[in-house]
Amino acid sequence: MISLKPVTKENIDELLALSIREDQRTFVSTVADSLAQAYVYHETAYPFAVYEDDVIVGFIMMAYYEVKQYYTLWKFLIDKNHQNKGIGKEALRQGIDFLKEKFQVKEVYTGVVPNNAVAKKVYGDAGFKPTGLYEFGMEEWRLDCA
């Protein structure tokens, strides 16, 4: 069973041990970098450990992007040993549900590195669509939650 749980002192070491494939390193932030950003943006960032039963298998972080005044899927990774099992799809759904329940969002945004075909497939399958806008080298995608 997949679940999202807050980052705590009890699970941070397991989170920091997550790893991705070498070919994913240019697309995905490390958990350490993501948690540093969560610390700085603690009022608007929502980091979670992704669990499969009692094992941490990933990390997801949503946030409020103040510049554009919208909620975003900011960081997302599934450990290389747990990919291609549907875990990411379910974690993404739960992350979106968190934003819908907590903030009654009508839309969620994310950024995708233009040549990241895997992310485009995952987000496209979840209903995200490209907006045609680019920022910081990322292609903006939007999910209509209404």
Question: Which residues fall in each region the model found?
Answer:
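Short, Lys/Arg-rich amphipathic alpha-helical interaction segments
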Residues: 125-126, 137-141
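Conserved acetyl-CoA pyrophosphate-binding loop and the N-cap/start of the following alpha-helix
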Residues: 82, 86-94
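Structural preference for long, well-ordered alpha-helical segments within the folded cores
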Residues: 91-94, 98, 122
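Conserved GNAT acetyl-CoA-binding A-motif
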Residues: 100-111
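Conserved active-site alpha-helix within GNAT-family acetyltransferase domains
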Residues: 89, 114-132
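Active-site acidic-Proline motif in GNAT/NAT acetyltransferases
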Residues: 79-81, 85, 114-115
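Conserved beta-strand-loop-alpha-helix junction that forms the acyl-donor binding cleft
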Residues: 109-120, 136-139, 146
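Acetyl-CoA-dependent GNAT
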Residues: 2-74, 79-81, 98, 131-136
